[in-house]
Amino acid sequence: MLLKRYSLRCCCLTLLVLLAMTNVLHATTPEKGMFLVADEQLKDPRFRNGVILLIQHNEQGSAGLVVNRGSRLSLSAILPKDSSLTGDGRTLSYGGPVDPNTLLALVKVRNYPPEPADEVVEGLYVTGVGVLDEWTDFSAEVVSYRTFVGYTGWAAGQLGAEIQRGDWSVLQADA
């Protein structure tokens, strides 16, 4: 019961933060940088009450990160002891059920992103945790970051069908 209340609070808090930080418009066609909000009738427990940030959407398919679920994995338990990312006691967020061996990071930077990195919305990039750990300009450039284990994925056309079925609401964010 306590875990359910915590999850609901976490979901509500995440949505409030996202709404406070962005101008939100409803959209019907998904694009990279948009949020997917799970419909309350969505039966898959991995996505129930979920909010997903699309980090990729093209003719080959879509990928995203669940932004409102934590995990019990600590970053320090996975990365080497000499990693620059293990000192602050962060835990990994649950990014989704696809490839739980993948470690990704969303990074908000001042000027220049790590290489390689893909811009999701203006100033917010997705990259591998290893790239972030090896980035020499980390302390000078990073405003904030969040790490994820796994991601969500859809085959070509699959996400569009789920949106038409009413499984997801699409929110356009303008950072």
Predicted regions and their residues:
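Generic extreme N-terminus detector
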Residues: 4-6, 25, 61
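Bacterial N-terminal signal peptides that target proteins for export
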Residues: 2-12
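Bacterial N-terminal signal peptides
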Residues: 10-23
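A short aromatic-anchored loop/beta-hairpin motif
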Residues: 27-175
